[in-house]
Amino acid sequence: MENKKVIVGISGGVDSSVSALLLKQQGYDVTGVFMKNWEEDDTDEFCSAEQDIADAQAVCDSIGIPFKKINFAAEYWDNVFEHFLIKYKAGRTPNPDILCNKEIKFKAFLSYVHLLGGDYIATGHYAQTRLAADGSVQLVKGLDDNKDQTYFLYTLGQEQLRQTIFPIGNIEKSKVREIAKENNLVTFDKKDSTGICFIGERKFKEFLSKYLPAQKGEIHDENGIKIGMHDGLMYYTIGQRQGLGIGGVKDRPEVPWFAAKKDLENNVLIAVQGHDHPLLFKQSLQAIELSWVAGMAPADKFRCAAKVRYRQKDQSCEVEVNQDGSVNVTFDQPQRAITPGQSVVFYIDDVCLGGGVII
């Protein structure tokens, strides 16, 4: 470890704070860097970037490591946000956190780490790396199953993983808070952020409407009968119940309505009644833009487990790789609310193989 230089991304949260502390305790030469990836365009209550910077600075001062700030707002806009808007406009529901890890934290930030003369990059993700028998680096689930974040990291390749340390990957979240408290870090009881990567806790619909004009349209039931109006297809995600604005439809039972499908051609949202309506379930999917941690798929056809959303339990499936690199995934059990634009991520036991974007 002696003199190995690690640059840790400090977000102002408890996970990255403890990551920096542990690295320092392990004898690394540690520098904390706060990435500013979004230019605030308002002063509303949800813009907490200033507080995050102050907390990040306080943590670094407390640990006794240098603190730096870097602005990646232009890179974030070009490589994450614009892509995000294009997908939303097309009626997809993209996952910006995955793209942010790929384009910002493990690309733009990694380049900056090299400029600083860093040997390693470190983040507060709940994930682990492991050396496989063939010398490749595996991306492994975090010890805390409830917090495992490999779903968001599946685009990382060998070169990135060889230069990455996840200091809290083998620790439970409760223990992380305990360590922060014992060491008097100001972030010990700070709540976890749930907003979109770097856009914070703002009201999403309001936020999106600033950038994309919404096209209102009709909501139909599965038989094509109009039952309401929607505010714009981009605001809805498959399986969504809240915010459909359908209530008390004449001659229909008082059962909740769910968004089941988007008819993009006709700008119609199709809704069905009941959480377990058959139209909400599918047994297969196709995915594109595949990324394999090892550099290639394990085989042309293989069995594994998959998640179609963060925190979903692993689902057994068969994966078939097509000539064009896309995959067909067939699940043993039908899956609820498979959402185009979201990612499907593959696992064998606790090893993340990679993933792709659902179409």
Curated annotation (Swiss-Prot):
Keywords: ATP-binding, Cytoplasm, Disulfide bond, Nucleotide-binding, RNA-binding, Transferase, tRNA processing, tRNA-binding. Residues 147-149, 309-310 are annotated as: Interaction with tRNA. The record marks 125, 342 as: Interaction with tRNA. ATP binds at residues 9-16, 35, 124. NCBIfam families: PRK00143.1, trmU. This is tRNA-specific 2-thiouridylase MnmA. The active site is at residues 100, 197. One of its GO terms (molecular function) is ATP binding. Belongs to the MnmA/TRMU family. Its EC number is 2.8.1.13. Residues 95-97 are annotated as: Interaction with target base in tRNA. HAMAP family: tRNA_thiouridyl_MnmA. InterPro entries: MnmA-like, MnmA-like_C, MnmA-like_central, MnmA-like_central_sf, Rossmann-like_a/b/a_fold. It is found in: Cytoplasm. Catalyzes the 2-thiolation of uridine at the wobble position (U34) of tRNA, leading to the formation of s(2)U34. Pfam families: tRNA_Me_trans (PF03054), tRNA_Me_trans_C (PF20258), tRNA_Me_trans_M (PF20259). Disulfide bonds join 100-197. One of its GO terms (biological process) is tRNA wobble position uridine thiolation. It catalyses: S-sulfanyl-L-cysteinyl-[protein] + uridine(34) in tRNA + AH2 + ATP = 2-thiouridine(34) in tRNA + L-cysteinyl-[protein] + A + AMP + diphosphate + H(+). GO terms for cellular component: cytoplasm.
